[in-house]
């Protein structure tokens, strides 16, 4: 028979194991909304308190906050030079309250990090927000406001083979993102999936903002950028205001 002390030790072990599994499950799915990067567009200047630009900006912030956040948004208000243009988009697997929470975080973060700048961009794990005085046409890709991040660890094994297969998989996802929706209302602009690469399982996603015409072109450019920053890394991403790509060796996509 088990003694009460042995039984107690077993219960403690099960409890600790359960906590570890829960922590691993949460962290592996990347359910956080970490701050990633920001950029103040200093060339667009600053606005004064209670100016027409600030009124337009506050109107847009309040207007967008009333949506249900199922996809990205692009709105403008006022006439130049006091127009405020928004590009806001959540990650393809972040929607509803998660997206709304990220929007509130992004607005607060932008006000704090780029105080009174007319133009600014901020990226979080679940969304990004861009405010600008310039209303770019949908045919123009924004390759200037981009950045990359990568896992500090390198993969084990054949780096060249991994890089090639990883890029091929991202190109496959880019083709899927550029296909029409089932209801014919537009392109998907988002694709994610997994692929077995030897002993590793690759998790990846690609996404374009809903205001551009050439999604596939933008994604292909971002995939090529991975070669400049992140060869052989266990995970990496290239983010911008037109599109982004990401891959990891752990699950980070909501299903």
From Swiss-Prot:
Family the entry assigns: Belongs to the cysteine-rich repeat secretory protein family.
Intracellular or extracellular location(s): Secreted
UniProt GO cellular component terms: extracellular region
Signal peptide: 1-28
Domain of life of the native organism: Eukaryota
Main location: secreted
Protein name per its UniProtKB record: Putative cysteine-rich repeat secretory protein 32
Assigned keywords, A-Z: Repeat, Secreted, Signal
PANTHER family: CYSTEINE-RICH REPEAT SECRETORY PROTEIN 29-RELATED, CYSTEINE-RICH REPEAT SECRETORY PROTEIN 38-RELATED
Species whose genome carries this gene: Arabidopsis thaliana
């Amino acid at each position: 028979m088990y003694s009460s002390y042995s039984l107690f030790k077993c219960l403690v072990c099960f409890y600790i194991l359960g906590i570890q599994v829960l922590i691993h499950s949460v962290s592996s799915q990347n359910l956080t909304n970490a701050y990633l990067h920001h950029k103040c567009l200093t060339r667009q200047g600053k606005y004064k308190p209670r100016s027409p630009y600030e009124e337009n900006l506050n109107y847009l912030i309040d207007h967008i906050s009333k949506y249900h956040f199922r996809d990205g948004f692009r709105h403008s208000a006022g006439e130049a030079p006091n127009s405020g243009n928004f590009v806001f988009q959540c990650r393809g697997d972040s929607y509803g309250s998660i997206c709304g929470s990220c929007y509130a975080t992004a607005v607060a973060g932008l006000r704090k990090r780029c105080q009174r700048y007319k133009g600014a961009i901020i990226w979080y794990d679940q969304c990004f927000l861009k405010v600008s005085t310039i209303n770019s046409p949908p045919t123009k890709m924004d390759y200037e406001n981009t950045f990359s991040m990568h896992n500090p660890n390198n993969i084990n094994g054949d780096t060249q083979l991994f890089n090639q297969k990883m890029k091929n998989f991202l190109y496959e996802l880019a083709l899927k993102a550029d296909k029409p929706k089932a209801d014919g209302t537009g392109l998907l602009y988002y694709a994610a999936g997994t692929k077995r690469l030897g002993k590793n399982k690759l998790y990846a996603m690609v996404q374009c903002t809903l205001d551009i015409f050439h999604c596939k072109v933008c994604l292909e450019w971002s995939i090529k950028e991975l070669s400049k920053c992140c060869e052989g890394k266990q995970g990496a991403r290239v983010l911008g205001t037109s599109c982004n790509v990401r891959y990891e060796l752990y699950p980070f996509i909501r299903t």
